[in-house]
A protein has these predicted regions:
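Flexible, gly/ser-rich surface segments that form the specificity/activation loops bordering the active-site cleft
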Residues: 227, 234-242, 253-323, 339-347
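Conserved beta strand-loop-helix elements of the APE1-like EEP
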Residues: 105, 110, 250-257
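Coiled-coil termination/hinge junctions
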Residues: 209-231
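A short, polar/charged loop-to-alpha-helix boundary motif
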Residues: 344-357
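N-terminal Sec-pathway targeting helices
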Residues: 16-34
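N-terminal Lys/Arg-rich, disordered targeting/topogenic segments
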Residues: 4-21
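Catalytic histidine site
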Residues: 49, 56-214, 325-330, 335-343
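Bacterial Sec-dependent signal peptides at the C-terminal "C-region" and cleavage site
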Residues: 38-51
Length: 359
């Protein structure tokens, strides 16, 4: 009888231990994902090698132009704007004469600081960001802008007409055998083309004067210039994710939302990040000299350069080597921020999960 009681007691204790163990396991389950996230986050804080920094750099072509729209439909394209007038270089299409082109830097980034989440996203800059203030003022006074532009075109047409008359007189008193005749004939043809173009532009501007819903917008287009695994430069169209504003930074994304295999996106941490106002050694990863007018994109190669953070979020690396949009790391390989106007914009400025740059 006693042995039976002992056995029953033993079984009850065993059952109790099992319940206690199960309860501990169940209580611990929520901590498992947290622990995994912590481990991944800590791993993402590991220093980068210079090779990895170089694979994180991106080379981008930026193109921009202005459009005059009526009811949201573009009717004219031009290359420059003040708060009171459009340029007189107004075309009937967005051709190369009104399009500004520049080559800029960027860096591949992950959206989240604790897991790979690039999806083709690049942090870069907008060379025209400061123009949005002028654009806003011009649109508030769109009637005066259109009126002033019409007057400017009228003046240009008068000037072209006078020059054309002078050239035609020269041609009338000379013949084809005279020195310089062919050159003058060519110039006369060019003047007539310019005059015709200005007259067509003036016609469109005058129609816009009577429209109640005319507006001007600035169009920016980004194209990734990326070397594939074979070393060939491929062009990949990108979409702009960051809403247009006077702030300089933009998130762009490859049109297919894919990240090439041979790149290394960086993490923009919000905590435990190096201070940008301290004096320390730094490394910039960039495509040096990309702002040069005849920059060879096919021969472009990402490179790292050493320098110093000089305090007050500034650095001493020349703009030729540290263009706007280039990533800056500490000398031991920790992501520090982005170069812009000779300063270091810390990763904390972009917000958790890039919230300060996303819609």
């Amino acid at each position: 009888m006693q042995s039976v009681r002992w056995e029953a007691t033993r079984l009850m204790k065993k059952s109790t231990n099992r319940k206690r163990t199960s309860r501990i396991i169940l209580q611990s389950l929520p901590a498992v994902p947290v622990a995994i996230v912590v481990v991944i986050y800590v791993m993402s804080l590991m220093p980068c090698s210079t090779k990895k920094m170089e694979r994180g750099a991106a080379l981008i072509e930026h193109k921009s132009y202005y459009e005059l729209t009526v009811s949201g439909k573009p009717v004219a394209w031009f290359d420059a704007l003040t708060d009171s007038c459009m340029s007189d270089n107004i075309m009937l299409s967005a051709d190369s004469s009104v399009t500004k082109r520049s080559i800029i830097n960027g860096c591949w980034v992950n959206k989240y600081a604790f897991m790979p989440s690039c999806h083709g996203m690049i942090l870069t800059t907008d060379p025209d960001s400061m123009a949005y203030k002028t654009l806003a003022t011009a649109n508030k006074n769109i009637g005066n802008v259109i009126k002033n532009t019409a007057e400017r075109l009228e003046s240009a047409i008068k000037s072209l007409s006078k020059k054309d008359e002078e050239l035609r007189y020269y041609l009338s008193v000379h013949n084809v055998n005279d020195d310089g005749y062919n050159t003058m004939a060519y110039l006369d043809g060019r003047l007539k083309q310019q005059k015709e173009q200005a007259e067509k532009a003036l016609e469109i501007i005058r129609k816009a004067q009577t429209a109640k819903n005319a507006a001007i917008r600035l169009v920016s287009k980004y194209t990734l210039l990326h070397k594939d695994t074979a070393g060939h430069t491929v062009r990949i169209a990108c979409n702009t994710i960051t809403p247009a504003s006077e702030k300089p930074f933009r998130i762009i994304q490859t049109s297919d939302k894919q990240t090439p295999d041979n790149v290394s996106p960086t993490y923009l941490h919000q905590w435990f990040t190096p201070a940008t106002d301290a004096e320390r050694g730094i490394i910039v990863a960039s495509y040096p000299g990309c702002m040069l007018s005849r920059y060879d994109v096919n021969g472009a190669k990402a490179t790292t350069f050493s320098g110093k953070a000089t305090g007050k979020s500034r650095h001493d690396i020349p703009p030729m080597l540290a263009p706007d949009g280039a990533a800056i790391y500490t000398s031991d390989g920790r992501m520090m921020g982005i170069s812009y106007n000779g300063r270091i914009t810390g990763t904390g400025n972009f917000g958790l999960a890039l919230k300060n740059l996303l819609p």
